[in-house]
Amino acid sequence: MANTIEIRKGESGWGGPLSINVTAGKKIVYITAGTKPAIVDHLVALTGWEAVDGFKQGEPPAEEIGVAVIDCGGTLRCGLYPKRRIPTINIHATGKSGPLAQFITEDIYVSGVRVADIRVANDAEAAPPEVAVADVAVNAGKGTGRDYDTSKKITEQSDGLLAKVGMGMGSAVAILFQSGRETIDTVLKTILPFMAFVSALIGIIMASGLGDFIAHGLTPLANSPVGLVTLALICSFPLLSPFLGPGAVIAQVIGVLVGVQIGQGTIPPHLALPALFAINAQAACDFIPVGLSLANARQETVRVGVPAVLVGRFITGAPTVLLAWAASSFIYH
């Protein structure tokens, strides 16, 4: 077992390198779709830490997490662990992006990592450089400017009503300005690139002929209430829903294909609403571990809450489709 491991960014990756001291009792949390990434097994071999599946076993307490492994493409999960100052490894080459991008820094986050990018580091290399702060602290207490007497009439401080109103308005304007700046930043860095990606993906599928192939397969399912219920059960199946949910990409692609078929008259228009519920039956299933972590839920809550939500979506998916079908029958007839 190594004393310190060094993790460098992979090809086209960002951040790092991370130097992690191996401390007994820590755990490796991985929240990834599909099978366990190979780097998790490599980290277990180097550190001797226990690997914990965040989807199935829930997240351990923050003080027990030695490193977090994710597969985020630029959404909220990228910054979830860096915000809590937990070393984060992203197997995707995702940089500083997402709603929590301000917390993603090179000293706590590294992306595009492969097995070859993780190695044992010498203690001398891993030791962080000591910064001489004594002189800085001493110099910080010495002001170079002049001290002015604020007891004079012209310069004395006022805490009257007008001053309080001015300070309150200034604070409100600052908050609104910051919120607007963060909103624009999120739109430019997260929402617009994602919209462009989905649009390009749909265009490729439609132009390549793959869309027609998928549409022919979906038409029998989307052409009747029973077929839509079957589609909802497939999308919300607990073993599939966490992998179908990220970014709602699959739901958007299928929605476009179904919409084209409705426009062509292949699928009756009154089935549009139940079809919408059917293809979104898996909504939020991929976000449950992240949401519970943001809420600082206990480990027992995460362990019980994740499967409960997955099974709950599976149970409620079909009834919502039937309710939508009943409602749409009154709308279009």
Curated annotation (Swiss-Prot):
Protein's membrane topology: Multi-pass membrane protein
Annotated InterPro entries: PTS_EIIBC_GUT_C, PTS_EIIBC_GUT_N, PTS_sorb_EIIBC
Active site: C72 (phosphocysteine intermediate)
The EC number(s) this enzyme carries: 2.7.1.198
Induction: Activated by sorbitol and repressed by glucose.
Top EC class of this enzyme: transferase
Compartments where found: Cell inner membrane
Keyword Metal-binding in record: no
Residue span, PTS EIIB type-5 domain: 1-192
GO molecular function terms attached to this record: kinase activity; protein-N(PI)-phosphohistidine-sugar phosphotransferase activity; protein-phosphocysteine-sugar phosphotransferase activity
Residues recorded with modification Phosphocysteine: C72
Chain ranges passing through the membrane: 191-211, 220-240, 243-263, 271-291, 304-324
Catalytic activity: D-sorbitol(out) + N(pros)-phospho-L-histidyl-[protein] = D-sorbitol 6-phosphate(in) + L-histidyl-[protein]
Disulfide bonds: none
Cell inner membrane is among the record's keywords: yes
PANTHER family: PTHR39427, PTS SYSTEM GLUCITOL_SORBITOL-SPECIFIC EIIB COMPONENT (PTHR39427:SF1)
Functional description taken from the UniProt entry: The phosphoenolpyruvate-dependent sugar phosphotransferase system (sugar PTS), a major carbohydrate active transport system, catalyzes the phosphorylation of incoming sugar substrates concomitantly with their translocation across the cell membrane. The enzyme II complex composed of SrlA, SrlB and SrlE is involved in glucitol/sorbitol transport.
Domain notes: The EIIB domain is phosphorylated by phospho-EIIA on a cysteinyl or histidyl residue, depending on the transported sugar. Then, it transfers the phosphoryl group to the sugar substrate concomitantly with the sugar uptake processed by the EIIC domain.
Protein name per its UniProtKB record: PTS system glucitol/sorbitol-specific EIIB component
Gene it is expressed from: srlE
